[in-house]
């Protein structure tokens, strides 16, 4: 229950499903103890940004956090656009760039200007991504960050991303209000599948 001491919304993987949060709990925060006395804390800016929340076991379920900015435990990963971390100086960010990217941090910040979180979550929640993950994971029940990094992200014109963004917000709204969103989810999944189809110019090469 939210009170004067337990002020920060908190999630675990069992609290989320595709495009929805099923349950919210509250942690002590902004007190003399927390977060100042936490052991090995992650950097605050990771949580205080719009992000995609991803479970790390079983079938992938992603939801959008573009308002509340939840805290979460180790059963969840979160994905933040590089442009939204511009100016944040942190050793783990520098290490990630050096270890996992062929591009500079500045380049990735520029690349991320061309996509929105709604577009990325639509890809991650798609049937196509589920197939790719099944291939990447084999018999492994875990979803690791490298699995997510290895999902190719097709480029899409802004008009397509705008339509996808609208559908994502529609699905989220329908789920929050208990409305049937099957038709919207089907349309969204078909749009994502279409993006992965080779175009005629690719087939002629």
Region annotations inferred by a language model:
Residues 1-159:
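Polybasic, glycine- and aromatic-enriched phosphate-binding surface used to engage nucleic acids
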Residues 6, 14, 155-205:
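Non-catalytic DNA-recognition/assembly elements of restriction-modification systems
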